[in-house]
Swiss-Prot record:
The keyword Oxidoreductase does not apply. The modification Phosphothreonine is found at residue 394. The lineage of its organism: Eukaryota, Metazoa, Chordata, Craniata, Vertebrata. One of its GO terms (biological process) is regulation of B cell differentiation. This is Tyrosine-protein phosphatase non-receptor type 6. The gene is PTPN6. The keyword Repeat applies. The N-terminal SH2 domain functions as an auto-inhibitory domain, blocking the catalytic domain in the ligand-free close conformation. It comes from the Eukaryota. The active site is at 453 (phosphocysteine intermediate). Residues 244-515 form the Tyrosine-protein phosphatase domain.
């Protein structure tokens, strides 16, 4: 779950946001302006918005008769996980799928957003350095925050973990305070002040803020600010390392968690099939060649792994990739066997055949207009198209024993990646991926996209991670949470060493920042063309902007509270909830009556 709570939003504002920027299933929560202490859940249902009142009894939160929860967060999480449970009074199912988030209150990396006290304690105690701190959202009081600090005292006696102190940070009238007379304009000002003075507890003991615990999660729409933060040098005089170095080093230290078996690649009969002796596929995710003689050891082996986008749910049709090493003379036939059995129609090659005099990949296709047999398959090069950044080959593949069964395969070779480092700017890579995705989307029954470079981990990992993040943002919206470090960890759990260098790590950030900036501009143009009263459902978005919507900000409103609809949960009695309308909404087109 992410930051779906909007402190200063009226019902009319919520309706405007959800209609103008949301998609079906987008939702947000806000304080009730009718009943102090209660909350409202506003949900986009088709082209309309439903407002659901949430009761805060003082002991629990519920939907006036639904399940009861200790916190607002638990209530929202329950109904997002239990799809189909919420119904409108006319039986229309209400889906909570995509949170419409507020901006982060700060771009500082010590802000972790949505995090429980237990999760904060686990992180800080694992760090083990007294006076390490972070700031997170308050789950018990939405709109407030918590400063979690690792003390220098054990929690329960000698040998036990250090105690974590949680200090509530209240946001009152747009100012921040931990209580007392001191108030601050921003969270950053508050933290900077108490880094200098410490915080005195009621007992008289002091809590100090000495070492921030940095987050890698970021609101996608705020990634440009995060890039600026990561480019800053450390404050200490003995080092000039920037945040990108810190994050990448932290990622490298976590590589020990991915020590999965790689026994197949180590077999003597398979050693000649590996371009580099220590870059081997994990057994649990390796591509197994089908139809091979089981009596021949290693005959089903190829140095390639399936890579699944686990950022999206099973109902969101996330792409699957195959990450492979570049072909050797001994593996070309196996490569075409893999492409055929997986029904892959798009191959992405991110290297030249030779770079700086070194062989990177054996050409596994014939010259233009030529046909060649590779094992049991015939491959014909029907044509090549050169662009500034890449070359596109159209290949036809068929089994030698069935020439009438022909598949067309599009081979995209990126030619502008420098021999060392990364491209100077990401525009070429983003355009390249846009063409690839348009092709893949035009082939509804196509199998995984095959991506390879030379070793199949550096450029290959970089391209796959960028594409995964773009797909995630395009599905969930520009204000969704992304975590580049954790995304790479997820990919590395499927193939070892994906994303090899700090430069590649930073390039992913820069590429996603440019993708978001470009998408924002395209979305603004589309919205201006449709006019302010436009409905998302009437807009045809480009593939890379599917479901994209702009970020909501924490803005106050003078509007009054508006419509609530009677609502019930399945197997619960229908509650009678009186509709509340402001005078200017009496004849609003926002009525939720369904046809």
């Amino acid at each position: 779950m992410v930051r779906w709570f909007h402190r200063d939003l009226s019902g009319l504002d919520a309706e405007t946001l959800l209609k103008g920027r949301g998609v079906h299933g987008s939702f947000l929560a806000r304080p009730s302006r009718k009943n102090q202490g209660d909350f409202s859940l506003s949900v986009r249902v088709g082209d309309q918005v439903t407002h659901i009142r949430i009761q805060n009894s003082g002991d629990f939160y519920d939907l006036y008769g639904g399940e009861k929860f200790a916190t607002l967060t638990e209530l929202v999480e329950y109904y997002t996980q239990q799809q189909g449970v919420l119904q409108d009074r006319d039986g229309t199912i209400i889906h909570l799928k995509y949170p419409l988030n507020c901006s982060d209150p700060t771009s500082e990396r010590w802000y972790h957003g949505h995090m429980s006290g237990g999760q904060a304690e686990t992180l800080l105690q694992a760090k083990g350095e007294p006076w390490t701190f972070l700031v997170r959202e308050s789950l018990s009081q939405p709109g407030d925050f918590v400063l979690s600090v690792l003390s220098d005292q054990p929690k329960a006696g000698p040998g036990s973990p250090l105690r974590v102190t949680h200090i509530k940070v209240m946001c009152e009238g747009g100012r921040y305070t931990v209580g007392g007379l001191e108030t601050f304009d921003s969270l950053t000002d508050l933290v900077e002040h108490f880094k200098k003075t410490g915080i005195e507890e009621a007992s008289g003991a002091f809590v100090y803020l000495r070492q921030p615990y940095y987050a890698t999660r970021v609101n996608a729409a705020d990634i440009e600010n995060r890039v600026l933060e990561l480019n800053k040098k450390q404050e200490s005089e003995d080092t000039a390392k920037a945040g990108f170095w810190e994050e990448f080093e932290s990622l490298q230290k976590q590589e020990v968690k991915n020590l999965h078996q790689r026994l197949e690649g180590q077999r003597p009969e398979n050693k000649g099939k590996n371009r580099y002796k220590n870059i081997l596929p994990f057994d649990h995710s390796r591509v197994i060649l089908q139809g091979r003689d089981s009596n021949i050891p290693g005959s089903d082996y190829i140095n390639a792994n399936y890579i699944k986008n686990q950022l999206l749910g099973p109902d969101e049709n996330a792409k699957t990739y195959i990450a492979s090493q570049g072909c050797l003379e001994a593996t070309v036939n196996d490569f075409w066997q893999m492409a055929w059995q997986e029904n892959s129609r798009v191959i992405v090659m991110t290297t030249r055949e030779v770079e700086k005099g070194r062989n990177k990949c054996v050409p596994y296709w014939p010259e233009v207009g030529m046909q060649r047999a590779y094992g049991p398959y015939s491959v014909t090069n029907c044509g090549e198209h050169d662009t500034t950044e890449y070359k596109l080959r159209t290949l036809q593949v068929s089994p030698l024993d069935n020439g009438d069964l022909i598949r067309e395969i599009w081979h995209y070779q990126y030619l502008s990646w420098p021999d060392h480092g990364v491209p100077s700017e990401p525009g070429g890579v983003l355009s390249f991926l846009d063409q690839i995705n348009q092709r893949q989307e035009s082939l509804p029954h196509a199998g995984p996209i095959i991506v390879h470079c030379s070793a199949g981990i550096g450029r290959t990992g970089t391209i796959i991670v960028i594409d995964m993040l773009m797909e995630n943002i395009s599905t969930k919206g520009l204000d969704c949470d992304i975590d580049i470090q954790k995304t790479i960890q997820m990919v590395r759990a499927q193939r070892s060493g994906m994303v090899q260098t700090e430069a590649q790590y930073k390039f992913i950030y820069v590429a996603i920042a440019q993708f978001i900036e470009t998408t924002k501009k395209k979305l603004e143009v589309l919205q201006s063309q449709k006019g302010q009263e436009s409905e998302y459902g009437n807009i045809t978005y480009p593939p890379a902007m599917k479901n994209a919507h702009a970020k909501a900000s924490r803005t106050s409103s003078k509007h009054k509270e508006d419509v609530y609809e009677n609502l019930h949960t399945k197997n619960k009695r229908e509650e009678k909830v009186k509709k509340q309308r402001s005078a200017d909404k009496e004849k609003s087109k926002g009525s939720l009556k369904r046809k």
